[in-house]
Amino acid sequence: FNRVLWDACLHCETGEVVGILGRYGGGKSCLMKVIYGELRLKDQYVAIDGKALLTRERRPEDMRYLLQQSFVLPGLSVKQVFDDFGVAFESFVKDFPDFAGTARKRMKAFSTGERRIIEVYAVLASDSKFCLLDEPFSFMMPLHVQKMKEVIQREKKRKGIVITDHYFEDVIDISDELFILRSGKIWRVNGREDLELLGYIRNTNGV
């Protein structure tokens, strides 16, 4: 038995990107699941606008959750995916023109990275107060990561976003508030310097 969460507190507001960093297996995904209601702890408190969420159910208009692994059925078309999330396919193509003409293409026909782009965009662009993004940049090409970071910055104007990814430089780059999950606790950090002091990353001299 390994207790990965025992004193973790997180706050996110509309207009904010909150980044969570931590070692592999350190509890980042567990924290996301607790917030979303997929995982129940003995002592926990999750609230939106001061109203406690007492059940496991989360309304899409309140919160969307991007799982670490692919979650869209392979037989669905791209347009069906976006329709399910209330997102216009045309808006997606404006941001990612490489996908023009793929509205009827099935998800199983795309590469892993392409599927990730579609899934992340569907969650991000949907009408919800908050988005939880677990490893959104996995398998994406650098060009697409950069574009998705622009989408995140745009979408944060109307929602709060919590993100964790092993591409820590990208998380640092887009986060308004940055935390590290370590030994079951969440610590606020102020950029690379604090992460170096905590031993999460090496300093610029390679030490």
Annotate each predicted stretch with a short phrase.
Residues 51-64:
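ABC ATPase NBD coupling module
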Residues 21-23:
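The feature captures the beta-strand-to-loop junction immediately N-terminal to the Walker
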Residues 36:
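Helix-to-loop junction immediately C-terminal to a conserved catalytic motif
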Residues 65, 69, 74-90:
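Q-loop/switch helix immediately C-terminal to the Walker
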Residues 135-136:
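Walker B catalytic motif
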Residues 5-7:
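Conserved structural motif at the start of ABC-family nucleotide-binding domains
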Residues 185-207:
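Conserved beta-strand-loop-alpha-helix hinge in the C-terminal portion
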